[in-house]
Design a protein with these regions (language model features):
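Short, well-structured beta-strand/strand-turn elements
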Residues: 61-77, 146
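Aromatic-capped interface at the extracytoplasmic side
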Residues: 1-18
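Short beta-strands and strand-coil junctions in structured, solvent-facing domains, enriched
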Residues: 67-68, 78, 87-91, 108-109, ...
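Flexible glycine-/small-residue-rich
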Residues: 15-19, 83-87, 113, 123-126, ...
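Extracytoplasmic/luminal low-complexity segments enriched in Pro/Gly and acidic/polar residues
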Residues: 175-218
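Periplasmic/extracytosolic POTRA-like scaffold domains at the N-termini of outer-membrane
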Residues: 19-64, 110-138, 176, 186, ...
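Short, glycine-/polar-rich solvent-exposed loops and beta-turns at beta-strand/coil boundaries
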Residues: 71-77, 156, 200-201, 209
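Extracytoplasmic segments of membrane-associated envelope/inner-membrane machinery
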Residues: 82-158
């Protein structure tokens, strides 16, 4: 039985990506394209004895967006590729140089060679110190379902304030620094639900959360 299993050829490749569809940097199409590049002629028709599953795993894990990969054959000859993707939090768009994603652990993932993930973009005065703050803010946004749904862009203005540009058009939410982010989010959510729901979300162009225990709007 073991010998017969070794003779089993790869009849099909199934790729499973452990990530929400809108946040997939790695897709089945991309994995199959890479396999065609790494292995001349592809893997369909190759026998299990001729293929190092560990080699396939290492190659897939060399992709910057991949955290972990597990590869195995089932008894029907299907090559199963399970990919655990890094979690993109924000796309950094610097004034100079190439844009990239920041994933959990502040891991940089080049845009080249990945699919497009629907995460907030960050731009403006992006010094190294400010990028660290953008990462912290993005982490808090990602973990808050309301803020995650609201946030379109994170902008660093000329004074060094962090500003969230929401999907509500023509509005800015001034966060300021990364101190007391949970409190600022809580104030904003209450303001939207108890205030703007009655007068309209587009009533104010600027919502300033910088100041403790108050919201300044204009």
């Amino acid at each position: 039985l073991k010998k017969d299993h070794k003779r089993q050829t790869c009849d099909k490749i199934v790729v499973l990506i452990d990530a929400e569809v809108e946040q997939q940097l790695v897709t089945e199409r991309l994995i199959n394209e890479r396999i065609s590049t790494w292995y001349v002629g592809g893997l369909i028709g190759i026998s299990q004895s001729e293929l190092s599953l560990e080699d396939v795993e290492h190659k897939i894990e060399s992709m910057p967006a991949v955290l972990n990969a597990e590869v195995s054959f089932d008894l029907r000859g299907t090559l199963l590729i399970a990919v655990e993707q890094r979690k993109p939090l924000v796309r950094i768009i610097p004034i100079y140089g190439e844009s990239y994603y920041l994933a959990s652990g502040m891991i940089k993932i080049p845009v080249t060679g990945t699919d497009v993930a629907r995460v907030p973009i960050a731009n403006g005065r992006l010094t190294n110190a400010m990028i660290k703050k953008v990462y912290t803010l993005s982490t808090y946004v990602h973990e808050n379902s309301f803020m995650k749904a609201l946030t379109e862009q994170i902008f660093v203005d000329n004074t060094g304030d962090l500003v969230i540009i929401p999907k509500v058009k023509n509005q800015r939410i001034v966060i300021g620094d990364i101190t007391e982010l949970e409190e600022k989010f809580s104030k904003l959510i209450d303001f939207y639900s108890e205030g703007l729901n009655h007068i309209g979300w587009d009533k104010y162009k600027i919502i300033n959360l910088k100041y403790k225990d108050q919201i300044v709007c204009r």
